[in-house]
């Protein structure tokens, strides 16, 4: 009887936890310009082009003035929108320091094949804005996503801006 009660309690708590995350409203300012059904199946590449690979920025953001904005964390501690117009004035002048003080939502410290499986990933790369241990700019991502998916694009932008 005790074993059944413990199992039922665990199942009920799991269901409550699942439903509380599913019932969160979308982050404010979230705009979707494509449908998830339009995203093709994984082809072996770490990224996919959306919207015909055409940017769609509001007219007021088409400026040479640098800026960066970060959403506040939601009630579950998740990052929201990070948005910047990167200029040389935002780029760091010092080396990146440790970001281990930030524990992004979903963080698990695990190794696979001698490498850490998960990385603290900057939404806007450190080399672009110099934001180091900003919890509003760090998410949990796989090493593959960070190194193969995000870093090549960060490097392209940094090379262009320099």
PLM regions: where:
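N-terminal module-boundary/linker segments of secreted carbohydrate-active enzymes
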Residues: 28-72
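C-terminal motif of bacterial Sec signal peptides marking the signal peptidase cleavage site
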Residues: 17-21
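Bacterial signal peptide processing site
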Residues: 23-26
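Bacterial N-terminal signal peptides that target proteins for export
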Residues: 1-11
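Domain-level detector of nuclease and nuclease-like folds
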Residues: 55-162
């Amino acid at each position: 009887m005790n074993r059944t009660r413990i199992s039922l309690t665990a199942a009920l708590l799991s269901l409550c936890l699942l439903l509380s995350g599913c019932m969160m409203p979308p982050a404010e300012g979230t705009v979707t310009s494509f449908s998830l059904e339009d995203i093709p199946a994984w082809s072996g590449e770490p990224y996919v082009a959306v919207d015909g690979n055409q940017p769609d920025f509001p007219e007021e953001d088409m400026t040479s003035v640098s800026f960066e904005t970060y959403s506040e964390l939601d009630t579950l501690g998740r990052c929201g929108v990070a948005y910047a117009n990167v200029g040389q004035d935002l780029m760091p002048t010092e080396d990146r320091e440790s970001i281990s003080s930030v524990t992004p939502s979903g963080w698990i410290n695990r190794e696979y094949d001698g490498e850490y499986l998960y990385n603290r990933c900057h939404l806007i790369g450190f080399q672009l804005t110099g934001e180091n241990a900003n919890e509003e700019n760090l998410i949990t991502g796989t090493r593959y996503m960070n190194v193969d998916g995000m870093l090549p694009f960060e490097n392209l932008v940094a090379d262009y801006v320099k």
